[in-house]
Amino acid sequence: MADKKPSKEDPVNMVKLLTRNVLDGIFDDLMENNVLNTEELRNLGKGLNFMVNNAGNLVDNITEKAQMVGKILKDRLLSHPKQLSLEYQHESEDQESEESSASSSSSTESEEENEESKDEERAASAHSMAVPPTAPLEIQGAQPSGRLKLCPHAHFRELKTKRADEIYPVMEKEGRTRLALIICSKEFHYLLNRNGSELDLLGMQDLLENLGYSVVIEENLTAQEMETALRQFAARPEHQSSDSTFLVFMSHGILNGICGTKHWDQEPDVLHDDTIFEIFNNRNCRSLRDKPKVIIMQACRGSGAGIVWFTTDSGKASADTHGQLLQSSICNDAVTKAHVEKDFIAFKSSTPHNVSWRHEMSGSVFISQIIYYFKEYSWSHHLEEIFRKVQRSFETPNVVTQLPTIERLSMTRYFYLFPGN
């Protein structure tokens, strides 16, 4: 090998010469120890010579393209700073209307709103670092950790027999036609788009399918379109040979309803909770009579933070305003009495009047927790216990906080999912 010193002005040539010196020494050792014969060494040398000789062309090519890459990255970062933020957004229907009001306000009001916006950003950023380690919030949206734990058939048979009077009947897998409906709205005419909600959709679809449900998906609907979709779903004949159903709603929201895609303050577009319950009650959906009807809602219910500060250790618990007794009525056949609203459970992402948080990059915290706890415990725990575990994961308030609530619970038995059976 030539002993020529590499030029300091040509780093590529320097690397070439150093590489040749090192390889020559290695090849000599391989020949001396009979690891390679002359022909093998010649073929290997041809390939290495090609790589070394073309290294200069590669560096020139990279150098030329690096300038273009740098310009693209610079433009992207400066024109789309929001894509790099790791902020949580709440699902309140007030967001966009507040922005439209700001455009017509005085400069002083605009400055105040800017300060409030910065405070929210700081709080959201702090929340991402304030999540307690016991809450598995890294398990987000469509990428939950682990698989659904299946219930051993022997355990399923034993519990089904021993607690037959306490649990809802579970149909055999063969011939069973479970259905679930997911309504997810991401794009809105006047409200902010719900970026990250597609991960919630994929995660819930995967969970429900693994639990044995055929999932019907509806996206970006107005309130009227949502009502139509619900009535069509309630009329599906598959419910007759099913033992339960899930209804999942993901959108912006108000206190007692889900916002449609055309909602704004001047012209509300809201599907009210009462409408959902009315469509699936025993009067209007007899195919699901005496069968669990699980409603899950990811949406804000106001703009409150949902926290209170105490100066002492004492404090009064707030009253639950949704635990009202439901009246019973006579069904149309006038032969057998049945409660109009029965076998429902609604699990909402926040308490009344308060916000619910969603991460643009990983979806909503509420949905991710549901997915995690269902996968971990649905093989052995009934539904209310699983929901309670989700609630406990939110028990300690963080910088931004929410507390899921169980409402309009009219189940008279325990609902076990027995995944795998």
Swiss-Prot record:
Residues 1-92 form the CARD domain. The modification Phosphoserine is found at residue 85. The keyword Nuclease does not apply. Keywords: Apoptosis, Hydrolase, Phosphoprotein, Protease, Thiol protease, Zymogen. The active site is at residues 252, 300. Residues 88-131 are annotated as: Disordered. Its EC number is 3.4.22.-. GO terms for biological process: apoptotic process; protein maturation; proteolysis; regulation of apoptotic process; regulation of inflammatory response. GO terms for cellular component: AIM2 inflammasome complex; IPAF inflammasome complex; NLRP3 inflammasome complex. The keyword Phosphoprotein applies. GO terms for molecular function: cysteine-type endopeptidase activity. Residues 109-118 have a biased composition (Acidic residues). It is an enzyme of class 3 (hydrolase). InterPro entries: CARD, Caspase-like_dom_sf, Caspase_cys_AS, Caspase_his_AS, DEATH-like_dom_sf, Pept_C14, Pept_C14_caspase, Pept_C14_p10. Heterotetramer that consists of two anti-parallel arranged heterodimers, each one formed by two subunits (Potential). May interact with TRAF2. Involved in the activation cascade of caspases responsible for apoptosis execution. Belongs to the peptidase C14A family. This is Caspase-12. It comes from Macaca mulatta. The lineage of its organism: Eukaryota, Metazoa, Chordata, Craniata, Vertebrata.
